[in-house]
Amino acid sequence: MPMKMGWRWYGEGNDPITLSDIKQIPGVTSIVWALHNKMPGEIWEVDEIQKVADQIHAYGFDMDVVESVNVHDDIKIGLPTRDKYIENYKQCIRNLSKFGVKVICYNFMPIFDWTRTDLFHPVGDGSTALFYQKDMIQDDYKAMAEYIMSFTEKYNMTFPGWEPERMAKLDELFKAYAPVTKEKLWENLKYFLEALMPTCRECDIKMAIHMDDPPWDIFGLPRLLVDAESIDRFLSMVDDENNCLTLCSGSLNANPNNNVAEIVRKHCDRIAFAHIRNIHHFPNGDFSEAAHRDCCGETGIIEILRAYHDCGFEGYIRPDHGRQLWEEGPGNCRPGYGKYDRALGIQYMLGVWDLLDRLDEEKKKG
């Protein structure tokens, strides 16, 4: 069975792209979804899941991958209340298993999710893309939060990990995380996963951690999943087939020293979900997200896809952040999640995959 192509969808009324639009993209079989109205720590109830399931199944898609069931801060910090939220997370897993969910993507980044300094940065050809200016990410987390919040308020659009409810409590959160060292965060992640694994085995669901984005500490907050060494540590720390990776090529390659294809070859059996994203690097450490075509960035998309193909990857894959094209912009497009560039990216990925299939067939014929 080949890899299964997915598309991240933010839901009716929350995403300008419809399921009807997605149905017209060749090769997409899986909708990557979530209950985006739920706060970390809340239980996803069966009736809430059923509503989304009915929408997705009406168009013939599966809903095997959830991105994300976010982790409550008390779990990451290691507070005594974490056990209550872990029990809620277990119930989410049980409820999701009733609908055939196979993979839960999540992250363990303190306070912030993925971080960029410009959500619609001109890239020179008329399109825009997510951009990271390294010298803007210093100690002033408030300026960054205000930028994101000004966008969400103006366009009535929220981002996972940057919810207004969380941003209103930033000072409290930074105080709560102050004692949490990198080693303590590792300990808290291990505690969380060891508590979940029996439920994951019972429900046949894989927990697939997303790489930290970008892969270095920001605002004094530790990041864990940043390179090959940390991935080795993570997988050996809880050595269970249900403890897996969401391997994001763009998150890792924001650091050009990371060889994503090598990581794929080493850990393919523990990659449940793959994100394919291309990055263009600047000499000063800034980076811009780029089109998926290999030559448009320095991530090595062809070699990454070849690594997955050589390993016989049968998991789920999706195009990650794309550019905004053809009149897409603030107000009608989620940053990084436009319709056109991701659709183009899928066709590029499938074209490379089909060629690799054909080369294998010809090799077998001799």
Place the predicted regions along the sequence by residue.
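Catalytic domains of carbohydrate-active enzymes, especially glycoside hydrolases
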Residues: G13-H36, Q55-Y59, N95-I104
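Conserved beta-strand edge residues that scaffold enzyme active sites
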Residues: H36-N37, N70, P110-I111, P214, ...
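Acidic/aromatic-lined carbohydrate-recognition and catalytic surfaces
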Residues: V65-F99, V103-V123, S127, K134-A145
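Extended, charge-rich helix/loop segments that form flexible
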Residues: I111-W114, D118-N188
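An N-terminal, globular interaction/scaffold subdomain
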Residues: E45-S68, Y85
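Glycine-rich, proline-tolerant flexible connector loops at the mouths of alpha/beta enzymes
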Residues: A34-Q50, F219
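Histidine-acidic metal/acid-base catalytic patches
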Residues: M1-G6, G11-G13, D54-H57, D74-G78, ...
